[in-house]
Amino acid sequence: MKLEKIIKGITVNEIIGDASQEISGINMDSRLIEPGHIFVAVKGTQTDGHTYIQKAIEKGARTVVCENLPETLIENVTYIKVNDTEDVVGKLATTFYGDPTSKLELVGVTGTNGKTTIATLLYNMFRKFGYKTGLISTVCNYIDEEAIPTDHTTPDPITLNKLLGRMADEGCKYAFMEVSSHSVAQKRIGGLKFAGGIFTNLTRDHLDYHKTVENYLKAKKAFFDGLPKTAFALTNLDDKNGLVMTQNTKAKVHTYSLRSLSDFKGKVLEDGFEGMLLDINNVEVNVQFIGRFNASNLLAVYGAACLLGKKTEEVLLALSTLRPVAGRFDSLRSPKGYTAIVDYAHTPDALENVLNAIHEVLNGKGHVITVVGAGGNRDKGKRPLMAQEAVKQSDKVIITSDNPRFEEPQEIINDMLAGLTKEDMRKVISIADRKEAIRTACMLAQAKDVILVAGKGHENYQEIKGIKHHFDDKEVLRDIFANE
């Protein structure tokens, strides 16, 4: 594709060089540059791409998009100066990869909790309907049946457009995508056209990056502010920020709720470890999910499917056949008669939701043992809150490590313990070794008890000092059960 066509949709301050040349690729990472590529110099949170311009040229970059021109300009290299490279990179990638979202029905899911479940269930549902479908999520990306491993909730804009381009080329009609607050703030979704957006909820998370809850809210809201008139905005009325999210959107607003009058109204009629009986818009449906938070997620899935033109009867039938997402309220039964639940809950609110769900089903007939940690080099303010929530709703709590990254595990544990009283501490054991913590919980559990292993969910690693060591909560539990 010619450079002049790729840059047509962006505001350019200055062009130095030949804009008619053929471009073979686009990248923000100088290490991935190949001959004939565009290098976009983006100022990131860790490094400034402008310092790698020379390296990119040495690797064969024919064009450099930058905010500041380098002191020395190289002959036969085209320089394009713009105000904000972070803002234009998504638009450049969208054009280069053939505007993939004009050929797909793309739905974005944003919120603190529930994104993975909702996006994945919509992907599974639309495949059941017989459509080729794409998924972009924390757990894994999919182009119909093909799995593509992922590192981020939302990939960088170039990877994202390349992925969406492949989905469109391979005949996908729908794509469902988690939209993180980071991706909105860093303009990773720039240039994409959404058919719809879903808001789940907003609670404390990622304050290491956003600094304040208000900034976090603004990042989520910006997604809805950017939706076109042709899109739908489906929001959760049970969250106090539900209507705030959609107050400035051009999209058509629809609502879902378990408590209030709404377009998609739900009610939990029965709840057990095998599933729930729900009432959705006055029709009963059995589902294989547990807990009110999952009832809310399923309402969002139901609403989105209906807004995408599916008939209510086929949506309800599909809902009844869907299974929980990996690492989200994943339950395993021990030979000793207790239940272990592995869940990704890594915020105080998510922990509260999962523990509430456990108590609703247990109904006082067993004890709750919670194994929980907090991530290193992340929002320190939520650490004591996580411990407090665990203690409030558990009979025994084992504080342990969870991706300590570049911090010492014991220091993170100490931060969590700092939020507890002497009375609370009677319930608490701290064991830095996560495997030992899970083993101890299993030794303490009796028949009918429930162990919650929180924080990692689908993750199969422990990140320590920059290295990801293999670690899987479910594997550990299965090994323990095999020897009981």
From Swiss-Prot:
It comes from the Bacteria. UDP-N-acetyl-alpha-D-muramoyl-L-alanyl-D-glutamate binds at residues 30, 153-154, 180, 186, 188. Pfam families: Mur_ligase, Mur_ligase_C, Mur_ligase_M. A motif (Meso-diaminopimelate recognition motif) lies at residues 402-405. Pathway: Cell wall biogenesis; peptidoglycan biosynthesis. Keywords: ATP-binding, Cell cycle, Cell division, Cell shape, Cell wall biogenesis/degradation, Cytoplasm, Ligase, Magnesium, Nucleotide-binding, Peptidoglycan synthesis. Its main location: cytoplasm. Its cofactor is Mg(2+). Coiled coil: none annotated. The keyword Cell division applies. The modification N6-carboxylysine is found at residue 220. It is found in: Cytoplasm. One of its GO terms (molecular function) is magnesium ion binding. One of its GO terms (cellular component) is cytoplasm. Meso-2,6-diaminopimelate binds at residues 378, 402-405, 455, 459. HAMAP family: MurE (MF_00208). Belongs to the MurCDEF family. MurE subfamily. Catalyzes the addition of meso-diaminopimelic acid to the nucleotide precursor UDP-N-acetylmuramoyl-L-alanyl-D-glutamate (UMAG) in the biosynthesis of bacterial cell-wall peptidoglycan. This is UDP-N-acetylmuramoyl-L-alanyl-D-glutamate--2,6-diaminopimelate ligase. It comes from Phocaeicola vulgatus (strain ATCC 8482 / DSM 1447 / JCM 5826 / CCUG 4940 / NBRC 14291 / NCTC 11154) (Bacteroides vulgatus). The lineage of its organism: Bacteria, Pseudomonadati, Bacteroidota, Bacteroidia, Bacteroidales. The gene is murE.
